[in-house]
Each structure stands twice: as structure tokens, then as C-alpha cells.
Amino acid sequence: MSKVIHKWKSISLIEENVTLPTNVVVKHTTINHPGAAVILPITSSGKIILINQFRPSLKKWLLELPAGTMEIDETPLQCAQRELEEETGYSATSFQSLGQVTPLAGFCDEIQHLFVAKDL
């Protein structure tokens, strides 16, 4: 059994029965997320570009790397290129993948694709 409890843009809150490796069935709630790209932009002089964003869920400003949610049919690289330009005004000619992380794996299926952007 799987049901959508709430949906916002491309993110859903899903409740479903999951069979654990021990064959025990539990009800689990997951945030279904399309994935994201996180970019480490480095200027030709070796400086890292960060952005200052207000995060309503924490009610404070945070200094962050540029990042954003993948759009439908968008590759991780395309997302990284788009987000870098949208959030910083910079574009890069060189993107290197650093792999991926799943920072909230206990309750969210989001995969964050990590990139270094150079030649801004």
C-alpha cells in the first residue's frame, strides 16, 4: 500500500508499507524528491562563491553553496549549470562531478549530485 499524503511542486510525502530485511512489514513515511545539484564554484583566483539565503524553516540566514532541485527530464549536470547561473549570475566552462550523497536517507529519497565548477 502506498498513498500520497501531501504534494508540493515536484516533492511528495508518501506513506507506504515497507518490508524490512528481517521480513517485518512497517509503515514508513518518505519525502519523495526528484534530486538536486550542489555546486562548488571556484573562481580563477581560487575563491569559492557562496550565497546568503534566508531559510524560512530555520528562520535565519545561511551561507550556502549554490544548489537546487532538478526539473523534469533535466540531467544533474544541466541542473548544476542552471542553478549556478540563477543563484550567482556566473556560468562555468568546466564542471567536474564529485559523485553523490543522500543526506536525509532516513526519511527522504533525495540524491544530491555534487559538482566543482571552474572557469567562471
Q: Which positions does each model-derived feature cover?
A:
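A short coil-to-beta-strand element that immediately follows conserved catalytic motifs
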Residues: 91-98
